[in-house]
Amino acid sequence: MAQFGGQKNPPPWATQFTATAVSQPGPLAVQQSSLLGASPTIYTQQSALAAAGLASPSPANYQLSQTAALQQQAAAAAAAAAAALQQQYTQPQQTIYSVQQQLQPPPQAILTQPAVALPTSLALSTPQQAAQITVSYPTPRSNQQQTQPQKQRVFTGVVTKLHETFGFVDEDVFFQLTAVKGKSPQAGDRVLVEATYNPNMPFKWNAQRIQTLPNQNPASAQSLIKNPAAVMQPVAQPTAYAVQTQPPPQAQTLLQAQISAATLTPLLQTQTSPLLQQPQQKAGLLQTPVRIVSQPQPVRRIEPPSRFSVRNDRGDSILSRKDDRNRERERERRRSRDRSPQRKRSRERSPRRERERSPRRPRRVVPRYTVQISKFCLDCPGCDTMELRRRYQNLYIPSDFFDAQFTWVDAFPISRPFQLGNYSNFYIMHKEVDPLEKNTAIVDPPDADHTYSAKVMLLASPSLEELYHKSCALAEDPIEVREGFQHPARLIKFLVGMKGKDEAMAIGGHWSPSLDGPNPDKDPSVLIRTAVRCCKALTGIELSLCTQWYRFAEIRYHRPEETHKGRTVPAHVETVVLFFPDVWHCLPTRSEWENLCHGYKQQLVDKLQGDRKEADGEQEEEDKEDGDAKEISTPTHWSKLDPKIMKVNDLRKELESRTLSSKGLKSQLIARLTKQLRIEEQKEEQKELEKCEKEEEEEEERKSEDDKEEEERKRQEELERQRREKRYMLPDEPAIIVHPNWSAKNGKFDCSIMSLSVLLDYRIEDNKEHSFEVSLFAELFNEMLQRDFGVRIYRELLALPEKEEKKDKEKKCKKEDKRERKEDKDDDDEPKPKRRKSSDDKIKLEEKEERKRDDRRKEDYREEDDPDYENQDDYEPIAAEEDDGDYDDREDDDDDSSSKDKREDKRDGNRYSKERQSKDKEKDKKQMVTVNRDLLMAFVYFDQSHCGYLLEKDLEEILYTLGLHLSRAQVKKLFTKILLKESLLYRKLTDTATEDGSHEETDPLHNDILGNCSLLPSKAVRTGLSTVEDKGGLIVYKGAMVDVGSLLQKLEKSEKTRTELEHRLQTLESKTEEDEKTISQLEASNRNLSEELKQTKDDVGHLKDSLKAAEDTRSLYEDQLTNTIKNLSAAMGEIQVVLNKNPSTTEDQKSKENGSS
């Protein structure tokens, strides 16, 4: 929390307080400039904070002017003094904090606090009463979204409840004692709290860190908590000295309000006095707070107001000097702008360009820098109880534990680290599913010996390529994949046993001499056989296929005398060996996986058929029993009986079926049955009348109910069938099948796959011995990964070339030459016009050439030092500082320049260079690729939030924890190669442009990879032993010398080849499936086209027939038309002839008529 101290960045707690009157005990007067942000005056800390309404400091991004805001609040307090005075006595339910400043104490009061030096304005101003003074802060950048609630806050509070392992702050914030940093708090202590909000927890606010504030009076604070009503009453102090007559209560209240309102501005305006400054130390939640003990001062009287004016004048003089300096700087800026008007115009245009360019690239929220590093050496060979407590504070240590040996240091030395990326996965079957092969292994044999136990931790890891893409955010990945990154600890998982609900345990058991062999301390294969047998019995996994068994850790317990299964076991030492086998060799091949899938499907079919047969058999038996009962108990209808002609046996059967007495003579039986038959006849007649009316309704209801029942039964059967099929279905990718032994551990055993991050998230409440073993293994595995990744980083730093300072020197020399040329030009008072023009042209040419050279140098620097444009948002703080430095250089050059043409050319050149750089950036964004993925994963494992950089102090701790015994000088020399502003931008080492895709891998067996270990005698002995072991790789097997190392290498090669072949086979199968789908689609389309062609041919035939018929009809019509025309022409001729003959006949008739007349 050092960044919250001093006067630069106030800490981010922003709670509002009501400041009226607060009473604090005397010992709370302490100088604490880191929390108040002002000078450590004699003024009481808690009363000053309460009077200012700032019981908790302001947030880090507090941008408002403190002086203006506090003066406005003081004025508002003075205006509301009269009204607030009445409310003080009429509203006792409000929380009122009494500020009893010892300005005018009651008569004969003992001054238990030091004297308070206040400004004169407090004594001379009119009485006022403080109203509620609150300080509003701007919303932090991370919480600008209005819809999201506040997830995290930092504040100061009081411990209200404290239990054995947890407590509460302000009755609302829950914290565990493991989160306390420094001194443990007591009930009533004021503490600094960093809390997070989680709505899914029982207590919404949970404290992540707790730190006790220094110099507190626990008795006084505790009394305030126990008696809150006393806070609202005026403090009565014993009388000792007669200082001044006590003012009336109203005047005293007004004076207190005046103090609380008027002391805001001088308190926070006063600068830190050099005489009162404390040495600056980095304080934080993770460090022990520096306690500053207030010096006791003699009791004295309050001096007249003239004493106050001195300190007020002193503060005013300091402020006036500061204002004079600010005004002087402003005048200098105005003079410089008046001397260069063109520069003023250029500066006025620059913000507009920024406003136009800003929407192109929105700034994203930079993630919080989170790095977790172990604070101890990672090559420790063993630990005892004290060392485990120091290393893992949240780890429960069993009472019988006394020693642990970390043998993974020898199993995975620095020269042969553990290789991630061996794909393996597990699939846990349901307890209903039976294994295909019967499991005959025994978990707890009768002769089990508790002196040795063997347990295994089985790894489930994705492939190396998948691990890179999911955790490293590669430069060539799409943005969705990069934003959804996961830490490698979330992707690396282990198969563990579960005893009960949340009790994880390693899979294994005790050694059996009869089943595993004798002498486990001498023969390492004995415990391996124990692990194979117990794992087979508990999970059904056959570990005999594993080729390498790494002895990861040995845990020893001192067991007292006990009774186990009726026999007394004397006191002994139990050694638990944790093995880490290469379980990925047990993964079934693709063909074996297909056979397993077929076997479980067949098992499901057999079970379904068996269940159906059982159901059918039960149904037949029920039907048969119902038929028999129906034959026996169903009486004959009354219309079919005639009691007078029935025999005695028949009469008795009918009476028994009607639950009537069958005893007596035949006449009695006949009379009894006849009477019953008459009753049945009458009832049936009545029922027939009712039945006719309700028969239809009942029939409909019965059908609907039967249909609903049938549908529900079918639906339940379908759901059950799908559920059972899902239990028997296997995933597409091959996995190791796990059948947990449900009868083991008193029927509470189960299996689960848990990630490394979940195993590391243990609690002190996990107080089981088997949970302790799993948690310890998780810590050791995490430390092994940290060591391997740290060595990878160290190896890369060793391979880097020394940093060249030649370019910096050239740049410096050219700047000096340029400055000298400018000075020579200024000394020339009266140059000739032509001469000046020619000199200006030369200068322009030189500047252009120099600008070109600068552009080349910038490009070279960009190619060498800043290739990661794709993740440039991660480096914005450092990039901003570099840009500020460049801007300062340009500003100095502009101040030195006096020619308008030079400024124009420079401005054009800068604009051209910026445009070119922006284009290059856009071009480089598309061309960045990650070439060193191993190194990127090493950095990402430590940089959990993917900030893109590691600070120098964290990188230094990483190198110190590797066990290489490096000196500080050696580490600093490594850092000079790559560090920039105390940080390492690791993307510069891992990413490069597409053109520079060639990457030289560093030699894993570097000469200096062991650091200074070779200089230590103890390490030399261990190295010699390891060389002897390496030379002893030949063994005699069946009369032949076998080189185990070469066999393992060949096995590894064959495994890689098999994996590649399976991958290719899978790819070919997928392609074949796609080709088959394509062929089927083509065949279907071909069939459709053939059908369409046939249909088209048929249509063409029909069209030809219709065409022929149409042609025949056309010819017929033509013949008919021809004949018609001929007939018409003949008729027309005849008509014409007739018409020609008719006129002569009429003329002859007319002449005859005229002659006769």
Swiss-Prot record:
Residues 300-341, 348-359, 685-694, 701-721, 804-824, 838-861, 897-926 have a biased composition (Basic and acidic residues). Its main location: cytoplasm. The modification Phosphoserine is found at residue 1157. Residues 289-365, 608-641, 685-721, 804-926 are annotated as: Disordered. GO terms for cellular component: nucleus; perinuclear region of cytoplasm. Keywords: Activator, Cell cycle, Coiled coil, Cytoplasm, Phosphoprotein, Translation regulation. Residues 617-628, 862-896 have a biased composition (Acidic residues). Transcriptional coactivator for nuclear receptors which may play an important role in regulating cell growth and apoptosis. This is Cell division cycle and apoptosis regulator protein 1. It comes from Xenopus laevis. The gene is ccar1.
